[in-house]
């Protein structure tokens, strides 16, 4: 009985210690800031994991505010029928070191934000208008499970860091969503463009073997992405 009690006690202590570390494990992907703000000097030649700071005296109030995503772009500007207005550190230097960024995405009817991955951030989004099919694909060890739901205006969704996902406008009118990331530079890997539009190209035999299709199919798909996104 005494041995069993000691075993249970040790287990409880282990769980408590693990929970105490939880905030460290789930904190933002970017490093914590060491000052109130560090407005990115995008012209600096200093190489760091992020951007060097402008002198505080050179940073006006405007670095705290942006109207860039107040309006969207042309949804017919590319074959996907969508337009992404980015608000990461390159577009909003004030978020440098703060571990946040945003995007606005507008969709034509039938438009899509193709399957892609954000390797450095979790994504949280809200649909402002229209209705979007949001799809998320789990990892291989989770059985490649596909999760999806039609998300309507005022509803939200979350994309775990690194998982493949997409959005598709299933409505008859244009749709808009705004998403935020826990990184100033979440990165993006578009799956179709990565496979068939890389620079230099992935060797065709590799894709033929991996996708289990004929050479002609791979060459056709490559021809669709020669101009990029």
From Swiss-Prot:
Q: Which residues hold Mn(2+)?
A: 116, 118, 123, 165
Cite the Cupin type-1 domain residue spans from the record. Answer: 67-219
Checking Gene3D superfamilies in the record gives: Jelly Rolls
Q: Does the keyword Kinase apply?
A: no
Which GO terms of the molecular function aspect are on file?
manganese ion binding
Where does this one sit in the cell? Secreted, Extracellular space, Apoplast
Keyword Metal-binding recorded: yes
SS bonds (residue pairs): 38-53
Q: Where is the signal peptide?
A: 1-31
Complex and partners:
Oligomer (believed to be a pentamer but probably hexamer).
The record's family statement is: Belongs to the germin family.
State the protein's purpose: May play a role in plant defense. Probably has no oxalate oxidase activity even if the active site is conserved.
Specify the protein name. Answer: Putative germin-like protein 3-4
Q: Which organism is it from?
A: Oryza sativa subsp. japonica (Rice)
Task: Provide the organism lineage as a comma list.
Answer: Eukaryota, Viridiplantae, Streptophyta, Embryophyta, Tracheophyta
